[in-house]
């Protein structure tokens, strides 16, 4: 546990380093800390903080910079978030961006607004497409070809083209749609499949054929899993802390391309309440100590369905990025729930 003097100096050092990007020396700490301390006393405290692994001294400078461990202590115990006025400005921007519309477009807009407001990379883990349906409609395209339209409880509209063994008239398709919606709406397609086995003797053959085809078309699609949307990854090329080492930056862009570890991180974050902050290697996202990830889950009708966040340098203004992520998650939840 740090004493108040050491806490003040560490907080001042991190705030100045975030603002200026240069190692912080004792003269700067004396000027901004508000403490009446001699340069020698400040240097002694800095030496103690270095022994604790909270700051390091680059070889080319007499000043010091925070370590990931130092950032962690700062974020957990010393951080003051932006003022109410700043949060209101963020809220207005996010509300304007997240206009009602198709859920996929709203989620993509959330990734974009995260990137634009933070000036880093915005990421959103999209909801896993529901195998539960709210409504189904069949539309005849041509002989033995039918368009299956599925509406999920989240408001997502999915289209499938079905090839059938025989032709169906428009009236038969309407009858099948009405029957399915009346008897099976709100169930998963696996439940529908199970119910069909139980009720097959009570149904006409053509009705059974259509429903089996609909269930198969709905559950055989490979795009029902979660996906990651990324916006503004090129912003990271403008971050001096990262662009100075292109080899490490290429590793990060490989992660963006493959998305597997990013999906795993966001999936883990969705099981925690509120904003989560992963500093340096805590994320296990990339072998880059200079990266941090700020995430928050979002909901539809009170149920967590995904995660969003910002990826940027450890030298990010956490007091500004945390409200951006938190507000975007809350407003995305509200917008999707109102669909």
Swiss-Prot record:
Report the protein's function.
Negative regulator of class I heat shock genes (grpE-dnaK-dnaJ and groELS operons). Prevents heat-shock induction of these operons.
Protein name, as recorded: Heat-inducible transcription repressor HrcA
Species of the source = Paraburkholderia phytofirmans (strain DSM 17436 / LMG 22146 / PsJN) (Burkholderia phytofirmans)
Q: Name one GO biological process term.
A: negative regulation of DNA-templated transcription
One annotated GO molecular function is: DNA binding
- Which one Pfam family would you cite for this protein? HrcA_DNA-bdg
- Give the gene name: hrcA
Keywords assigned by UniProt, alphabetized: Repressor, Stress response, Transcription, Transcription regulation
As for family, the record states:
Belongs to the HrcA family.
Q: Does the keyword Transcription regulation apply?
A: yes
- HAMAP family hit by this protein: HrcA
InterPro entries (alphabetical)? GAF-like_dom_sf (IPR029016), HrcA (IPR002571), HrcA_C (IPR021153), WH-like_DNA-bd_sf (IPR036388), WH_DNA-bd_sf (IPR036390), WHTH_HrcA_DNA-bd (IPR005104), WHTH_transcript_rep_HrcA_IDD (IPR023120)
**PANTHER family recorded:** HEAT-INDUCIBLE TRANSCRIPTION REPRESSOR HRCA
């Amino acid at each position: 546990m740090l004493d108040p003097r050491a806490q003040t100096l560490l907080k001042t050092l991190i705030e100045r380093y975030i603002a200026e990007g240069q190692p912080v020396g004792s003269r700067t700490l004396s000027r901004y800390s508000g403490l009446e301390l001699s340069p020698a006393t400040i240097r002694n405290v800095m030496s103690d903080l270095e022994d604790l692994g909270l700051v390091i001294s680059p070889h080319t400078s007499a000043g010091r910079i925070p370590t990931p461990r130092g950032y962690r202590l700062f974020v957990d115990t010393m951080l003051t978030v932006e003022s109410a006025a700043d949060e209101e400005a963020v809220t207005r921007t996010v509300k304007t961006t997240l206009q009602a519309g198709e859920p996929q477009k709203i989620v993509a807009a959330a990734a974009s607004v995260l990137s634009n407001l933070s000036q880093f990379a915005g990421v959103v883990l999209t909801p896993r497409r529901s195998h539960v349906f709210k409504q189904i409609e069949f539309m005849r395209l041509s002989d033995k070809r039918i368009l299956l339209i599925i509406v999920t409880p989240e408001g997502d509209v999915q289209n499938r083209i079905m090839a059938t063994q025989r032709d169906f008239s428009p009236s038969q398709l309407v009858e099948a749609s009405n029957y399915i919606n009346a008897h099976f709406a709100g169930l998963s397609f696996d439940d529908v499949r199970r119910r069909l086995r139980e009720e097959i003797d009570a149904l006409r053959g053509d009705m059974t054929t259509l429903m089996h085809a609909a269930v198969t078309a709905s559950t055989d699609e490979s795009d029902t899993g979660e996906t990651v949307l990324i916006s503004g990854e090129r912003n990271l090329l403008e971050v001096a802390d990262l662009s100075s080492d292109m080899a490490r930056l290429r590793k990060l862009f490989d992660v963006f391309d493959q998305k597997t570890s990013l999906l795993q991180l966001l999936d883990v974050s969705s099981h925690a309440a509120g904003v989560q902050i992963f500093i340096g290697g805590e994320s296990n996202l990339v072998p880059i100590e200079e990266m941090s990830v700020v995430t928050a889950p979002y909901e539809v009708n009170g149920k967590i369905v995904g995660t969003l966040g910002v990826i940027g340098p450890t030298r990010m203004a956490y007091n500004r990025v945390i409200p951006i992520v938190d507000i975007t998650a809350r407003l995305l939840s509200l917008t999707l729930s109102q669909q």
